[in-house]
């Protein structure tokens, strides 16, 4: 039986992971969970799965949750904040940590888990975007496996299995194009938050959905793929694929291209990561090729959706530049969600921060955390209306 901690259990990835655990309860034990502030959802999860530990990272939610649990006389130990996260990823009786929190909050707990020798099911792309060099070196040192949960990276992971890595010519990351595919820059000037959150294919949290609308999500995935698969940026390509059926592709030196196809259901890549290297019957709907009308592919419009180009630029610069880009994006997306800036302001803010802040080729975890504070403060102070 595999014993698991889930960071971000009340979010989109976390709740879908629970579906897998329910279906396969003989093979999994949920030992610890975390949520930022979703008290009621977490109470239901604790009631159902009876984990040994639960963490909340927002103080009022933590106090409220603790009060509810004391009234219920639950056995679950309740912890708070980053210290709580660092505790539940390093528990001696867990085998794997699913990191499905959004943003840089996932970086330090993931590092703590790796230092403790726990395998990682990685849904927090910021961990590799911001600290990829440190994280991958640490994983090798501690002989820890990192299994990608993003559908695109899971697809690539599956397509390279059993093949010679040296034979890989290109990686193709597919993207739906988001809700604004085909629009001009002028047509995006006054788009609303509601429009940006209307993703055509995937069910995700708000931050990831906005990132998909700007194509920043794909840019972050390019950087993530660079570190996950040790692949030069020149060999990582993005292809717009509106049907979201082909989740990514790998081209080999003989011209052969291997692709992974499935329905748009995140439970499949989550299940593959949790069960690796076994395949089990999945909860997802099967593809029906006889009713599949079209598979189309097109080049991304990086002039209109500039964050994708900026992500490539940041990745190629290296050092702390991806961290600067990521932190600027987190701050800008938050401002957009609260109607403080316009949609196109996001790319302007990213570019300004990349030009303003000095990039360093050598850095520590503490340096990255300092960058987060500095960049986010700058964006908030300068661009909040």
Curated annotation (Swiss-Prot):
Q: Which cofactor does it need?
A: Mg(2+); Mn(2+)
Q: EC number(s) on record?
A: 1.1.1.267
Q: Where does Mn(2+) bind?
A: 150, 152, 221
What is the top EC class of this enzyme, as a single word? Answer: oxidoreductase
Name its pathway: Isoprenoid biosynthesis; isopentenyl diphosphate biosynthesis via DXP pathway; isopentenyl diphosphate from 1-deoxy-D-xylulose 5-phosphate: step 1/6
List positions binding NADPH. Answer: 10-13, 124, 126, 205
Instruction: Look up keyword Nucleus and say if it applies.
Output: no
Q: Name one GO molecular function term.
A: 1-deoxy-D-xylulose-5-phosphate reductoisomerase activity
Q: What does the sequence similarity comment in the record state about its family?
A: Belongs to the DXR family.
State the protein's name: 1-deoxy-D-xylulose 5-phosphate reductoisomerase
Q: Which organism is it from?
A: Clostridium kluyveri (strain ATCC 8527 / DSM 555 / NBRC 12016 / NCIMB 10680 / K1)
């Amino acid at each position: 039986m595999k014993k698991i901690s889930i960071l971000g259990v009340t979010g989109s990835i976390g709740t879908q992971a629970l579906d897998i655990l329910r279906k396969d309860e003989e093979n999994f034990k949920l030992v610890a969970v975390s949520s930022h502030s979703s008290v009621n959802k977490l109470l239901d999860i604790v009631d159902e799965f009876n984990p040994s530990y639960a963490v909340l990272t927002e103080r009022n939610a933590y106090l409220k949750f603790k009060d509810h649990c004391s009234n219920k006389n639950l056995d679950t130990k309740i912890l708070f904040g980053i210290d709580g996260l660092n505790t539940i990823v390093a528990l001696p009786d867990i085998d794997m940590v699913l990191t499905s929190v959004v943003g840089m909050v996932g970086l330090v707990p993931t590092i703590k888990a790796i230092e403790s020798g726990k395998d990682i099911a990685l849904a927090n792309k910021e961990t590799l975007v911001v600290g990829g060099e440190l994280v991958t070196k640490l994983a090798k040192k501690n002989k820890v496996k990192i299994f990608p949960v993003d559908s695109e990276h899971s697809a690539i992971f599956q397509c390279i299995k059993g093949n010679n890595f040296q034979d890989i010519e290109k990686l193709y990351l597919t993207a739906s194009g988001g809700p604004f595919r085909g629009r001009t820059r002028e047509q995006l000037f006054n788009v609303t938050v509601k429009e940006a959150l209307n993703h055509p294919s995937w069910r995700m949290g708000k931050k990831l959905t906005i990132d998909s609308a700007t194509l920043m999500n794909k840019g972050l995935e390019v950087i993530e793929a660079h570190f996950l698969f040790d692949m030069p940026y020149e060999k990582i390509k993005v292809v717009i694929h509106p049907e979201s059926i082909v989740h990514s592709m790998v081209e080999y030196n003989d011209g052969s291209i291997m692709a992974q196809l499935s329905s748009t259901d995140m439970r499949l890549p989550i299940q593959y990561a949790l069960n690796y290297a076994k395949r089990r019957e999945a909860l997802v709907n099967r593809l029906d090729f006889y009713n599949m009308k079209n598979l189309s592919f097109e080049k991304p419009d990086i002039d209109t959706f500039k964050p994708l180009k900026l992500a490539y630029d940041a990745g190629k610069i290296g050092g702390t530049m991806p961290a600067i880009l990521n932190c600027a994006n987190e701050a800008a997306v938050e401002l957009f969600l609260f109607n403080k800036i316009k949609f196109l302001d996001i790319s302007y803010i990213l570019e300004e921060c990349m030009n303003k802040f000095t990039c360093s080729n050598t850095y520590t975890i503490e340096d990255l955390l300092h960058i987060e504070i500095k960049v986010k403060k700058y964006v908030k102070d300068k661009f909040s209306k």
